[in-house]
Amino acid sequence: MDALITKGVDLLVATIRRLGRQVTYWRATQPIRMKVNTSKTAFEVDDGYGGTRIVWTDMTFLVPAADLVLGGQKVTPQRHDIIETDTGLRYEVLAPAGQSEWQYVDPFNKLIRIHTMAIG
């Protein structure tokens, strides 16, 4: 079963690298050019009155983990990093209160889902 999942994840990584959307990932003044897949993610958050409400990220980026390299070191996303699309739109790595800004998508840590909010 692991072999099948590995092949599927590897195929998805290869597809993103070949057909994905070009972005620039920024940490301070250090850029990383990479291809990503984009979507949106819904979160359930406490509404402060004993209930919950649904909050959507402005954009969720699916990134091959091996492509997040700064100064020769593999890194993981950090809150307040910036992702800039090829059209100039900018997104800050953020998630609703109590949620993680990113997580690995697969059991082999080959893909990362990054949650963001639009900043311009």
Summary of predicted features, one role per range:
Residues 1-34:
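Active-site-proximal polar cores
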